[in-house]
């Protein structure tokens, strides 16, 4: 009898492994099989009976994981908080580690394999997977920072019910790089600008100076060439779905002007949230205090943010 009870309990544990539930909100592993491996994600489902609207959340640039955390910038849990708040309001969500990042690290054997379109094509496959899941009635995209451009591009390739842009850059990446590097000494910009313009034209650059290897090493050039092809304003203008553009006025990385540029492309007025920074939190206006929020995983989202997102999804 004791053995039978043990086996039943063990079976239940195996079934529940990878699933968690908090306050009626359930999280489970939700993965996408692609050529060469698996992209690992998390599905957060509200309490109650579906089908539910579902939002696919795409993280920002670099080593940012599904929760919005990065070994470079720190842990802020911003994207995880969005998922939880959506579920609390009856909306499911999918968030995932991009190929080459965190649990999905194994999909990239070499940095030179990765191009910007990989992220776009992966997201299209996620949209198709969610669209074929009977638990979901409609699919929305939430893209943060670089993830906003990736989500926008994916929305031009397949049908979605809406797109939420969070802290999306308004200019092509090559313009951003040139602008950021313009603060460097002239001898640096004299070297970097010609390299950027060559990459913009789709040509690789040999013999990059040692001091610029971190930016323009051979293995990253294919990604830069592919990324430079995309003009966010043009891409946003090609989306055939409802769009909302949300930007904080306390963002150290992306400006209100970026949001206005994107708004012109999409033919709408952006939503500007006073006091919100790049990681979607309410932050001090000084740079030091602002950056400290990047490493506070318990600091809540800006109080106005989720109302904007939830109202948009519910009304579209």
PLM-predicted stretches and their roles:
Residues 111-133:
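Alpha/beta-hydrolase active-site loop
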Residues 164-234:
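Accessory cap/linker subdomain of secreted extracellular hydrolases
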């Amino acid at each position: 009898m004791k053995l039978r009870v043990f086996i039943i309990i063990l079976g239940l544990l195996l079934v529940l492994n990878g699933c968690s539930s908090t306050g009626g909100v359930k999280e489970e592993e939700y993965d996408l099989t692609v050529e060469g491996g698996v992209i690992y994600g998390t599905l957060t489902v509200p309490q109650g009976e579906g089908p539910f609207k579902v939002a696919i959340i795409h993280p920002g640039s670099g080593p940012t994981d599904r929760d919005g955390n990065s070994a470079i910038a720190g842990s802020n849990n911003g994207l995880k908080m969005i998922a939880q708040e959506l579920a609390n309001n009856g909306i499911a969500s999918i968030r995932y580690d991009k190929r080459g990042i965190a649990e999905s690290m194994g999909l990239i054997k070499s940095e030179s394999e990765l191009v910007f379109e990989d992220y776009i094509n992966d997201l299209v496959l996620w949209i198709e997977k969610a669209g074929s899941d009977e638990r979901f009635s409609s699919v929305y995209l939430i893209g943060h920072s670089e993830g906003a451009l990736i989500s926008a591009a994916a929305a031009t390739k397949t049908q979605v019910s809406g797109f939420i842009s969070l802290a999306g850059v308004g200019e092509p990446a090559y313009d951003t790089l040139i602008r950021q590097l313009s603060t460097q000494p002239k001898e640096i910009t004299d070297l970097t600008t010609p390299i950027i313009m060559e990459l913009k034209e789709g040509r690789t650059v040999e013999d990059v100076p040692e001091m610029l290897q971190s930016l323009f090493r051979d293995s990253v050039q294919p990604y830069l060439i592919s990324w430079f092809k995309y003009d966010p304003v043009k891409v946003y203008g090609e989306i055939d779905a409802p769009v909302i553009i949300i930007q904080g006025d306390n963002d150290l990385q992306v400006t209100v002007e970026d949001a206005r540029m994107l708004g012109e492309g999409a033919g709408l007025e952006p939503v500007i949230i006073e006091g919100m920074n790049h990681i979607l939190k309410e932050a001090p206006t000084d740079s030091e205090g602002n950056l400290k929020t990047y490493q506070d995983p318990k600091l809540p989202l800006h109080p106005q943010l989720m109302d904007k997102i939830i109202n948009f999804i519910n009304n579209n």
